Curated annotation (Swiss-Prot):
Superkingdom classification of source: Bacteria
Name the record gives this protein: UPF0225 protein PSPPH_1399
Family: Belongs to the UPF0225 family.
InterPro entries the UniProt entry points to: NTF2-like_dom_sf, SEC_C_motif, UPF0225, YchJ-like_M
Amino acid sequence: MSSAICPCGSGDLLLACCGRYHAGQPAPCAEKLMRSRYSAYVLGLTDYLVQTTLPVQQSGLNREAIAQWSAQSTWLGLEVESSEVFGGKPEHAFVTFTARWHDGNGEHSHKERSSFVQNQGRWYFIDSTVPLKAGRNDACPCGSEQKFKKCCSPYVV
């Protein structure tokens, strides 16, 4: 494994690339987290995929479905189109990418603009398939201690 190339497409060794994030080191930016999540799908690291999703959404994830999709797919590649901060707030970012894979139904390509938020030095993926339940004046679900309307509301809705 020490000489394995990272599946994220960087061309670097896994241990020097996404492997360190899988081992617990915080990803330094949203793009690195997104790349490490793609690599986690390739490697079947379901726990990592759950742990790097916004904490308030983790209980809404279907671990079995994630593991099954990961295992039943042959991952063909990742292309990152862009990575950008949102609204001048360095703790909010979008990453636009295309992931390709093959499964029992053929070859697939999925382009997505994913949302990420940083809290206490860690980046988290905001899963659009798991609803965020917060009123405008409620504490933000990202854990920032700001009101939802002043933090993630304009970013995730």
